Structures are given as structure tokens and as C-alpha cells.
Swiss-Prot record:
This is Pantothenate synthetase. Belongs to the pantothenate synthetase family. GO terms for molecular function: ATP binding; pantoate-beta-alanine ligase activity. It is an enzyme of class 6 (ligase). (R)-pantoate binds at Q61, Q153. The keyword Hydrolase does not apply.
């Protein structure tokens, strides 16, 4: 397994693979890898000749009061996981490699970024789309793999790739959970013992909403009320948003008539966690 830090060096390797007509599966990450990332890597390994994992904590997708400076980093642990799952190449550039000069060009995807995390984290998806555009151009992958836990990100990236004619297939992979139901996340590392226990309220509230939907409830306000009521029973939980949106357009719906995304963002103490599920009538 190679660990490469420069765009020049990684492009030389990519060119060699392309000359040999090898397919490339790409898993973009910010590091501090866990079983959720591993599931993406395994899928990429199954479907491609070569697998690349990028590890880059992207500064332009963090807001001024967000956790960029303290975001967990552990390249040794990450490298071990990648080696275990037979990754061919880790691309781990420095910030100065990706952004050697002040950046004036940005990529925006309208409409899909108006709600959910796009509304609560201004500029976040502009940063995500911009860095992914750079990575797609540098690495030229055949397929790229994203977790469904970041459902809005997955929808935004799919639309960006469609609109800008990137010759890349975007693959969504299911949410991976702890045994007790908490969605795997690098930010779970921030939680103390009591907060970790309290964080289970996210999945519990979504399960109650799913039960109501499966029982025939079609009013999105009622579904939202079920989730809010459950979350409010947890003292350490502070709701950022609870949204029921169309799973394709990500626009709010009142009456549930087709495929929906039920998505929540909740602060447990100071840690912001997200979770979701999709439901089809």
C-alpha cells in the first residue's frame, strides 16, 4: 500500500493504472476511520481493480465556530485499517498541497443545499463540492463511494456529478451502526460516557417515527412531532433540526406520498450528530 502526499506523485500512479485500463474505486474521507468507512472500502474493493482512500480534513467546509482545529486525526490507525481492507493507495495531502494559494473558484449545488445541514451550516456544501471536484479531477476514479448517513451530501454529490458531466459513478452505502444503534461517526469520539449513552436518543426517536409511518401515518408534521417529543425527553439533547423531505429534491413535504428522507441533527452536549432513514410508500 502506498501513502502519497503530493498531487504530482498521485497523478503518476493514476496514469499508470489508467494506461493498464484498471478501474479505480475512490473513498473520500476526513480520516479517523471507523467501520462505516470500512464498509465503503470493502464495497470499493469488491467492484474495482484499484482502491484509493483520501484522508484530508478540508478546512473550507468548516464554519468559523466549528471543529476543524480539533477534528480527530490518527494517520497510523487509519493506515492500519486501510491495509487490513487492502487499499492500494492513501492520498494524504497537506492543506498547502490542496490550496497552495487563496482559492477564488468554488462549486455550488443550488436547491438541494437549502435545507437540512445546508441551512444550518452555511458554506459547508460549497466546501464539500469544491474539494470533491478537485479530488475527482486529480484522481479520475471510476466509482466513488459515500455513506448514506450523510444523505444530503450523497444527493448533492450525485447531482453535481450529473450536472458537470463527471465520468464517475456515485455509489451510496448503508449506514453502519454500533450494536446499540448509534450511527458510526468520527465525531462519536468527542462523547463522554454519559453523552454516549444519551446519543442513543437519535436512533430511538427515528425508530418511533418509522413505526408510525409503517402504521399508516402520512402527515409529516405528526411524524416530526413524534421525533421532537422523544428527543426533548433527553436532557443532554438539543435539536438542531428535524426534517421530513422528498428523498430526491430534499424539499419539505406536508403529506407523505412517495419516497421521503427523515433526517435529524442533534447536539449531545457540544457534539453535533446526524442520523436519518428513508421511507417509501
Amino acid at each position: 500500500m502506498n501513502i502519497v502526499n503530493t498531487i504530482k506523485d498521485v497523478k503518476l500512479i493514476i496514469k499508470k493504472w489508467k494506461d493498464e485500463n484498471l478501474s479505480i474505486g475512490y473513498v473520500p474521507t476526513m480520516g479517523y476511520l471507523h467501520e462505516g468507512h470500512a464498509s465503503l472500502i470493502k464495497k470499493a474493493r469488491e467492484e474495482n481493480d484499484k482502491v484509493i482512500v483520501s484522508i484530508f480534513v478540508n478546512p473550507i467546509q468548516f464554519g468559523p465556530k466549528e471543529d476543524y482545529s480539533i477534528y480527530p486525526r490518527d494517520l497510523v490507525k487509519d493506515s492500519s485499517l486501510c491495509e487490513k481492507f487492502e487499499v492500494d493507495l492513501i492520498f494524504n495531502p497537506e492543506t498547502s498541497e490542496m490550496y497552495p494559494n487563496k482559492i477564488y473558484s468554488h462549486v455550488n449545488v443550488d436547491i438541494l443545499t437549502q435545507n437540512l445541514c445546508g441551512e444550518k451550516r452555511p458554506g459547508h456544501f460549497q466546501g464539500v463540492c469544491t474539494v470533491l471536484t478537485k479530488f475527482f479531477n486529480i484522481l479520475n476514479p471510476t466509482k466513488a463511494y459515500f455513506g448514506e448517513k450523510d444523505a444530503q451530501q450523497l444527493a448533492v454529490v450525485k447531482k453535481m456529478v450529473e450536472d458537470l458531466n463527471f465520468p464517475i459513478e456515485i455509489i451510496g452505502c448503508p449506514i453502519i451502526r454500533e450494536e446499540d444503534g448509534l450511527a458510526k461517526s468520527s465525531r462519536n469520539a468527542y462523547l463522554n460516557k454519559q453523552e454516549r449513552k444519551s446519543a442513543l436518543i437519535l436512533n430511538k426517536s427515528l425508530k418511533e417515527a418509522l413505526n408510525a409511518l409503517e402504521s399508516g401515518e402520512k402527515n409529516s408534521n405528526n411524524i416530526r412531532d413524534i421525533i421532537v417529543s422523544k428527543l426533548n425527553k433527553e436532557p443532554l439533547a438539543k435539536i438542531d433540526y428535524v426534517s421530513i423531505v422528498d428523498s430526491i429534491t430534499l424539499q419539505s413535504v406536508e403529506k407523505i406520498q412517495s419516497s421521503i428522507l427523515v433526517a435529524i441533527a442533534v447536539y449531545i452536549g457540544k457534539t453535533r450528530l446526524i442520523d436519518n432513514f428513508t421511507f417509501k410508500l
